[in-house]
Swiss-Prot record:
Keywords: Metal-binding, Methyltransferase, RNA-binding, S-adenosyl-L-methionine, Transferase, tRNA processing, tRNA-binding, Zinc. This is tRNA (guanine(26)-N(2))-dimethyltransferase. It is an enzyme of class 2 (transferase). Zn(2+) binds at residues 246, 249, 263, 266. The keyword Phosphoprotein does not apply. S-adenosyl-L-methionine binds at residues 44, 69, 87, 114-115. One of its GO terms (molecular function) is tRNA (guanine(26)-N2)-dimethyltransferase activity. It catalyses: guanosine(26) in tRNA + 2 S-adenosyl-L-methionine = N(2)-dimethylguanosine(26) in tRNA + 2 S-adenosyl-L-homocysteine + 2 H(+). Belongs to the class I-like SAM-binding methyltransferase superfamily. Trm1 family. It comes from Saccharolobus solfataricus (strain ATCC 35092 / DSM 1617 / JCM 11322 / P2) (Sulfolobus solfataricus). Signal peptide: none annotated. The gene is trm1. It comes from the Archaea. Residues 4-374 form the Trm1 methyltransferase domain.
Length: 378
């Protein structure tokens, strides 16, 4: 295997040299013998900050590839009592051994196993699931491996089913009815959380989001796992619903059931998706801890981007409603010239931008107030 050394954060690791695996002058990370995607540096950078707050005793990186994620956690976040790095690809585990040793990690436990098999053998207070594609095949096993109040982190790059572009795939992987709606960038994350909650309930556990975000072409989500059938039931009853959007006027709301429901504004039948999670996407207490700490990581190459994202999330996190996509809403209202987002925010008063979409606005104000502002500013 042809290798090259790269620096990410405070570690240096060997990865497959892209020049040795190009096809017609192009390269995709999946073509290399071991997967390494530099485009996920932002994901790993922000995760390093989160793990530094959590300070877990046992870190399990179940799909390690080069080992970059787990190694960075150990070097930059927190020297956990135990670091478990696993990949079913023997080329990957050989590379992990080299990379761990080169970064001064002598006590890492390195496994060459199927991730699900490993996760049914271990218990951990921090498990990271960062697959190539959907995390769905690893949800149940990772929740099973989580100790009481443990954390499981998920990355999902299969946005097509989650955002409703591939409804049949979403039904198959996430057991949810889905199709493209105006706020699908956020709704996809809620569909994912809904699936995780239902899987946890099988084990008489439940989960609550600590921190989550959308970036580039993926979702990243950190959930706290709690034990108890009653907690599982309560979370399902309180936070698993459906979402309806009016295809005519753009009114949107959470609804109890997947049945024909008329829009209260114009009488059109809602487009409905779900089940999905309707609760908060962030723990406000944990978000404050991130905001207090992240400046200590100003050496990160993506620090400015992290700062920008966190500043937006801090503002939008206090609102309960799904964001309104002003571009899509204006189109439904037959308004061709969209007013500046800042002007709409000023008109509404209690509102913010959202990191999910550049033309999105998050507010708990009523639909009528939002449309009134849009119409008055055109």
């Amino acid at each position: 295997m042809k290798l090259k050394e790269v620096t990410e954060g405070k570690v240096r690791i060997f990865v497959p040299d892209p020049t040795g695996y190009m096809v017609e002058g192009k390269f995709d990370p999946s073509w290399a013998p071991v997967f390494y995607n530099p485009k996920m540096t932002f994901n790993r950078d922000l995760s390093v900050i989160v793990v530094s707050i959590l300070k877990p005793k046992i870190i399990v990186d179940a799909l390690s590839a080069t080992g970059i994620r787990g190694i960075r956690y150990y070097v930059e976040s927190w020297k956990s009592e135990q670091l478990i790095l696993n990949d079913k690809n023997p080329n990957a585990t050989s590379l992990i051994q080299i990379n761990a040793k080169n970064n001064g990690i002598e006590n890492a436990k390195i496994y060459n196993k199927d991730a699900n098999a490993l996760l049914y053998e271990v218990k951990s207070d921090y498990i990271d699931i960062d697959p190539f594609g959907s995390p769905a095949p690893f949800i149940l096993s990772s929740l099973n491996a989580a100790t009481r109040n443990g954390i499981v982190a998920f990355t999902a790059t299969d946005l097509s089913p989650l955002e409703g572009s591939s409804p049949t795939s979403c039904r198959r992987k996430y057991d949810a009815i889905n199709h493209k709606l105006s706020s699908s960038k956020e709704l996809g994350l809620r569909v994912l959380i809904g699936k995780i909650i239902r899987e946890a309930a099988i084990l008489e556990k439940t989960v609550y989001p600590l921190f989550s975000f959308y970036a580039d072409y993926y979702y990243r989500l950190f959930v706290r796992v709690e034990n108890g059938a009653r907690k599982a039931d309560d979370n399902i009853n309180k936070h698993l619903k459906y979402f309806g959007e009016c295809p005519r006027c753009g009114f949107q709301t959470f609804v109890e059931e997947n049945c024909k429901t008329k829009c209260p504004v114009c009488g059109e039948i809602f487009s409905i998706i779900g089940p999905l999670y309707i609760g908060p996407l962030y723990s406000m207490e944990f978000l404050k801890r991130i905001m207090d700490l992240y400046s200590n990581f100003n050496y990160l190459t993506s620090f400015n981007r992290i700062q920008k994202l966190l500043n937006v999330i801090e503002k939008e996190a206090r609102f309960k409603n799904v964001f309104y996509n002003i571009s899509k809403l204006a189109s439904k209202l037959k308004i061709s010239a969209i007013p500046p987002i800042e002007s709409i925010l000023e008109c509404l008063g209690d509102a913010s931008r959202t990191h999910f979409a550049p033309t999105g606005i998050r507010t708990d104000k009523e639909y009528e107030e939002i449309t009134k502002c849009i119409k008055s500013l055109r």
